[in-house]
């Protein structure tokens, strides 16, 4: 799932390197491929690259700090991690003023409110589209490598739209979320940014069962089944069909490790800044991420328990509490930091 900056960095440099090779010597190309792998991992600076490539590499390094190290940093080390990431992103913009990933990530860190960040994304989208479009149109050739290069040229715009879509959901602009999600799917129908997962939550928020059904007919539900199950459970709960809602929660308990603990805790995690966090499918982390993004559904309509009515109902289902008890008995560390 999700867009991995390290893999994209590898793709960018491999395309640049491939452009230096002759097509008439397959054995030489094979040797060159081995040489590229070694140089990429050991001597990256010796590979042919542009300032645009160097800037994206800095973005990939900043992503590792912000999205994957900062959430686990101590209070003492967090400021240094943040400062280092901002420095990398600023350097990326110096190398490539049209490094839109860096510009977006800096804004995410600096915007005083979610609404301010949302406004930044909405106002900047057209400029990013035009910039990425120019780079796409500058790619020559009609072979497979050229097609990949054109796709990569549009990826910053795709990530911009995906961030805009997620931001609209957070800010309660649900119709705009649907519009932005469809725009992202038009850029890449294969949906590498997994905007369909955001759309599933949005349809549940709007209580639009037909919209969710239509989405599921064209989306691959094997990519992120937790999002679809939570959306369907929320819809069933809203129409007071508790049996169907419980069936969807039961599916989560069967699909994911430590699902009882995850559904009981309902931790709210920081969003990935580069893109939705890259996690392995079917893992505990996938359900944790889905539950966090489904906060808009779980915390809707706070009751006397200071928790959303749907979220409280899920956390207190007998099958959830029983599963959590079994999981804690097997691994007491799961209870650390319990709310």
Whereabouts are the PLM-identified features?
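Solenoid-like repeat scaffolds
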Residues: 47, 90-95, 130, 150, ...
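Extreme N-terminal leader/anchor segments
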Residues: 1-94, 249-252, 326-339
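TPR-repeat structural position
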Residues: 82, 115-118, 174-175, 209, ...
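Long, ordered, amphipathic alpha-helical scaffolds
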Residues: 50, 234-339
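Residue-level signature for tetratricopeptide repeat
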Residues: 64, 75, 109, 150, ...
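Structural motif corresponding to the intra-repeat A-B loop/turn of tetratricopeptide repeats
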Residues: 68, 79, 113-115, 171, ...
């Amino acid at each position: 799932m999700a867009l991995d900056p390290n893999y994209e960095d590898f793709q960018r440099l491999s395309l640049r390197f491939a452009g230096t090779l002759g097509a008439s010597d397959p054995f030489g190309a094979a040797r060159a491929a081995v040489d590229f792998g070694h140089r990429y991992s050991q001597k990256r600076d010796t590979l042919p690259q542009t300032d645009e490539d160097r800037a994206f590499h800095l973005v990939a390094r900043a992503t590792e700090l912000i999205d994957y190290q900062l959430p686990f940093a101590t209070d003492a080390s967090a400021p240094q991690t943040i400062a280092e990431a901002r420095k990398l992103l600023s350097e990326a913009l110096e190398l490539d003023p049209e490094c839109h990933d860096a510009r977006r990530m800096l804004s995410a860190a600096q915007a005083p409110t979610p609404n301010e960040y949302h406004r930044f994304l909405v106002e900047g989208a057209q400029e990013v589209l035009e910039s990425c479009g120019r780079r796409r149109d500058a790619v020559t050739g009609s072979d497979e490598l050229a097609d990949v290069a054109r796709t990569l040229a549009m990826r910053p715009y795709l990530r911009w739209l995906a961030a805009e879509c997620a931001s609209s959901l957070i800010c309660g602009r649900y119709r705009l979320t649907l519009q932005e999600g469809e725009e992202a799917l038009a850029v890449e129908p294969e949906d590498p940014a997994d905007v369909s997962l955001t759309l599933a939550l949005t349809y549940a928020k709007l209580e639009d069962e037909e919209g969710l059904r239509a989405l599921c007919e064209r989306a691959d539900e094997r990519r992120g089944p937790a999002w679809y199950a939570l959306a369907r459970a929320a819809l069933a709960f809203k129409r007071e069909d508790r049996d169907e809602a419980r069936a969807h929660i039961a599916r989560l308990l069967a699909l994911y490790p430590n699902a009882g603990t995850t559904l009981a805790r309902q931790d709210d995690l920081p969003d990935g800044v580069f893109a939705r966090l890259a996690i392995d499918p079917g893992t505990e982390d996938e359900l944790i991420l889905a539950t966090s993004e489904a906060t808009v559904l779980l915390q809707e309509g706070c009751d006397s328990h200071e928790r959303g009515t749907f979220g409280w109902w899920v956390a207190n289902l007998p099958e959830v509490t029983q599963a959590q008890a079994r999981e804690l008995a097997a691994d007491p560390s799961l209870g650390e930091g319990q709310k």
